[in-house]
Amino acid sequence: MRLPGMLRPTAERHFHSIFYLRHNARRQEHLATLGLDLGNKSVLEVGAGIGDHTQFFLDRGCKVLCTEPRGENLDVIRQRFGSNPNVTVDHLDLDGDLPAEAHQYDVVYCYGVLYHLSRPAEALAWMCDRAVDLLLLETCVSYSGEDEPFLVSERASSPSQAITGTGCRPSRVWVMNRLREKMPHVYVTATQPRHRQFPLDWRANGPIASTGLARAVFVASRAPLNLPTWSRSFRWCSAGAEAHM
């Protein structure tokens, strides 16, 4: 007989599935190619899950405030990094009451989080206010050209889904416009991670990934980024576009 606690995977089993491990690897592999100065920074990591992205910044000499809304995920983060003097772990719900007087950090890191929020505009504004230099953002998006966040239902019981049960699939236009309301220099990457959920051709009618998800990577900066890896405008189809598996 299966016990009630065995009916769903633990947070570690959920986040360490083959899909998640490959997805994380492709995203951080891509981040490392973008030419950003991410060494020896103070970093606010939001929606950290179980902390699988945290080591990327620790390996670069950063000090990280690792935040997450779910208690079960925070327990895993504390087990992993509790003895590391460069990691502070704290509870933060981006869909909850956000502290107006929170500290600022050189870099705010928000990968795979925005589309799990029911109030994405408020969260983006708050994160921009926390960023001294950069806000790094990766999120699921819609193919729409409308300036809309497009709210959707999600499974609140899942350790990686919207804690309120409501998420969003904003258009790239919406994300760029909200960031431009708070930050002077906003870009989308000229390249994409080598993964099927990151399309190169945005002229299609919808995602080619079997999950039905399409993703994009953005940065909001206090200073201009004169780098070939970033673009101030959308590319609807990258040169030499090929399918990522």
Name the predicted role of every residue range:
Residues 136-160:
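Conserved class I S-adenosyl-L-methionine
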Residues 101, 146-151, 198-202, 231-232:
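Short aromatic-enriched loop/helix-cap "lid" or pocket-rim segments at secondary-structure transitions
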Residues 1-104, 212-221, 225-245:
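Conserved N-terminal segment of class I S-adenosyl-L-methionine
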Residues 185-221:
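Conserved catalytic loop of SAM-dependent methyltransferase domains
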Residues 116-130:
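A short, conserved alpha-helix within the catalytic core of class I
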Residues 62, 131-133:
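A short helix->loop->beta-strand "cap" motif at the edges of active sites that frequently abuts
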Residues 164-190:
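Short alpha-helix
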Residues 109:
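A conserved beta-strand element that flanks and buttresses the S-adenosyl-L-methionine
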